[in-house]
Amino acid sequence: MSDIALTVSILALVAVVGLFIGNVKFRGVGLGIGGVLFGGIIVGHFVSQAGMTLSSDMLHVIQEFGLILFVYTIGIQVGPGFFASLRVSGLRLNLFAVLIVIIGGLVTAILHKLFDIPLPVVLGIFSGAVTNTPALGAGQQILRDLGTPMEMVDQMGMSYAMAYPFGICGILFTMWMLRVIFRVNVETEAQQHESTRTNGGALIRTINIRVENPNLHNLAIKDVPILNGDKVICSRLKREETLKVPSPETVIQLGDLLHLVGQPADLHNAQLVIGQEVDTSLSTKGTDLRVARVVVTNENVLGKRIRDLHFKERYDVVISRLNRAGVELVASSDISLQFGDILNLVGRPSAIDAVANVLGNAQQKLQQVQMLPVFIGIGLGVLLGSIPVFVPGFPAALKLGLAGGPLIMALILGRIGSIGKLYWFMPPSANLALRELGIVLFLSVVGLKSGGDFIHTLVDGEGLSWIGYGALITAVPLITVGILARMLAKMNYLTMCGMLAGSMTDPPALAFANNLHPTSGAAALSYATVYPLVMFLRIITPQLLAVLFWSIG
């Protein structure tokens, strides 16, 4: 059997063994995709014992390509929500998550200096302790750029594997410990979250308001600032028994009922100006109006602002809200449409059908992947990651590398959405498939390279010490920030658990947090709020630590 055939066969075996290990769960918690790393270690141990020789060049290419695929698809997935998460609505959660990253970096630096841990080893421990595989790839990349011997770089994967299991368990232990310390009643926390509905970011809500302000009588909607802006959408108006879709020229009268869509604070301001909230239903049922969800798939409208399409004037149809990559947004007139946007339309059936034709609404297009933008994005990302930035006093030029470059490029392209007929939207199923393929390839190679000396390091070497160092890097930031968030910010416990899981980019921890109260969306919401920024920081941090430690000796 040729070297290439043998290498591919071994990688396939690693994937099978690793995915099987990852699917084994104890009390609902498992290693998940991280099991591939341990599958690689097991197979790598026996490959080393058997004296087999695998193609090192091929393994290196597969490892790097897997990493590129993984970080690129993550960037495309979270790009639309990344910049939104930095706005005021998610600022508090992101600040706490950033604090976790900073404290983790400080603990790593202190351990490195106190115990004289080799640079590749401490970076591997850091990456494993925070359960972040792209951080491992980024760290290995910068070490190679700094001229570190390959046998030392491979130690990073081994120390990563030592710290990884407690990284998974440590966050679960932290959630449990904080619950005990603060005597949390999960049901009460869920009810509090449901009553406020503002944790992690302002949600889109709807209210019905009766016009009671005499100053608004006989004014057109376009002349009422709170209704003519981009923060509140008036999607329905009911006068006596008639329900209609209002246009900017529609004149409102005392006693009219308005159905408004917006964020809670903006709706409260509208209520102060217009009148009292009422329980009267403004449902389209039994009327000549209907509500429909339409998907943007027509290339001719990509990048166009909602106001430029004149749906209100031409079709008497109102866009009440917009869903982009799972994030609900107020459909302000200045928003530019992107491929895959889901719009809530209110209007007559024939008018909605006409608007749907303009927007595309071709569901089959959502299942198709444009491969040209994928490779354009990857190519641009690799180029971006290869650009050197020279900093005086540093031994090597800083680069984003094969982990940071594709990630940042994907975040930008995901936010832009489309350029002409090229759109970077990727169906969730395709994105997940490419992402899982990438991480399986990457972890398989890392595990294989680490497997030969893993048992010896664990039993006769410093493996147990590495596990202890990793436990500190995992636990100290989580416990510190958890206590601060609860005591100082009075953060909801379920929201805090989601934030902690997001700060470790740890899906098993999110699953655990969701199971604390299955019907509450608090944990998932805060996880999604901090995930994009934290993923970016987790990839950049090992590179900064590596250059810092290298420069100060």
Swiss-Prot record:
* Keyword field contains Ligase: no
InterPro entries the record matches: AAE_transporter (IPR050144), RCK_C (IPR006037), RCK_C_sf (IPR036721), Transpt_YidE_put (IPR023018), YidE_YbjL (IPR006512)
Where in or outside the cell is it found? Cell membrane
Q: Does the keyword RNA-binding apply?
A: no
Transmembrane segments annotated in the record for this chain: 4-24, 28-48, 65-85, 95-115, 158-178, 371-391, 393-413, 439-459, 464-484, 493-513, 533-553
One GO term (biological process): potassium ion transport
Chief localization: membrane
Instruction: Name the PANTHER family on file.
Output: K(+)_H(+) ANTIPORTER SUBUNIT KHTT (PTHR30445), TRANSPORT PROTEIN YIDE-RELATED (PTHR30445:SF3)
Family affiliation: Belongs to the AAE transporter (TC 2.A.81) family. YidE subfamily.
Supply the name of the protein: Putative transport protein YidE
Q: Which organism is it from?
A: Escherichia coli O6:K15:H31 (strain 536 / UPEC)
